[in-house]
Amino acid sequence: MTTFHSTRSTTDSLTSKQAIRKGIADDGGLFVTDSLGETHVDVASLAGKSYQQIAFDVLSVLLPDFSETELKACIDEAYGAQWSDEKITPVKPLGDDYVMELFNGPTSAFKDVALQILPRFMARTTPAGGDGNEKIMIVTATSGDTGKAALAGFADAEGTGITVFYPEGKVSQVQELQMSTQAGSNVNVCAVKGNFDDAQSAVKRIFGDRELANRLASDSHVVLSSANSINVGRLVPQVVYYFSAYAQLLEQQVINVGDEVEFVVPTGNFGDILAGYYAKLLGLPVKHLVVASDKNNVLFDFLTSGTYNRQRPFYQTISPSMDILISSNLERMLYYMSDKDTRLIAMLMNDLNQWGAYEVPEPMLAKIRSLFGTGWADEDQVREMIADCWNKNHYVIDPHTACGYYVMQQMPRDPLTPRVLLSTASPYKFPRVVNESLGLDVSGTDFECMDVLAEATGTTAPAALRGLETADVRFDHVVDIDGMEGFVEQAAKAL
């Protein structure tokens, strides 16, 4: 039986449904399973399968307590007509390399892959304490993309409410409008005075507050859960697209079964790339996973030195979704790389909490570095790469993907190993930055920038983004970090 426990202790023993409903462990750790890797996905049978079929193969290994009927229903509901490409995450040639587009979902960012299915998972979980009236309040901090994708996934979902916090003034105009215009009777959106790390840390504190939990349960029949990638139900759907990429490379006759592939992944919270590590543990032939960061290059420093130090300046950059100093999902990778040493992980995370830094043992770092590569791009390089990619390939990339594109250009190429760049968001979410980079007009609004970009490149803005210009703003709340808990409590009472 596959059970889940915290990265920091083995006291819990939860099913995947319980772990998904709970979100985060009581001790602040993240849910992991020790059986990861015991069962492999059959790579030889991937070619020719649809995304939905591959999702079933992968998720039935990772979430064995969901029945075949439940999983198929979740997959069918999540990966249907709301996607603009039937391949869901299509792989396309990009010069001598490949790009996997993760932005064809309803909110134009890679988060849709997981956040279209997470609410379906949640709907098939049951209350832990037997309270038949129990409702779930999803509480999430966003650096830009998660918020809208979570809102779109959970809007009007039965028995569920959602509250999203984002750092005031630190997301793009398009991202902010995507959230503030969200429809749905069970949704709440609030800006926070602070940066993403402040908001995410406060959300983690809210989850750890037993008194608040007791009040919410007794007053409102509400339990809290998370839609951030700390929730294992957010992470596992992302494993699927690594297998899908491999299937598409097989179909395009780029590789034969068993050939290794490298993936270059723009990431801040480490979830997107951790999914690639999970794919490798499930038998996918992954040679290297390369972390691409922006100027907030805490992961680059960690992977080169073995010391993780969040005591550093926080930069607000043109790739806002990666402006993160506390990379939550790294904890799961450290757990597996330390041979599942919960005591070590608890100690490292305590050091991070207390001193703002930790250092991993040298042998463990060597093991990590044998799989994970790393690089980062500053803002000038990001702009140059958006232009370079357009000039060389006639392909428009957003500023996050451009970090990955830069790192990929810097890496030595092995002609025998295909490289796949994960493209995490539509360029139309950041039209001003993209236009600046391409030397196009940026004098108008973000929406005028979209039209200029479409005209100049012969591409089309996603209708949901272009339509934001005339959408009604429903939410304009702003709170201090200290006011977040009160905001959640009010939202829970209204559920």
Predicted segments with their positions:
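PLP-dependent amino-acid enzyme catalytic core
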Residues: 1-495
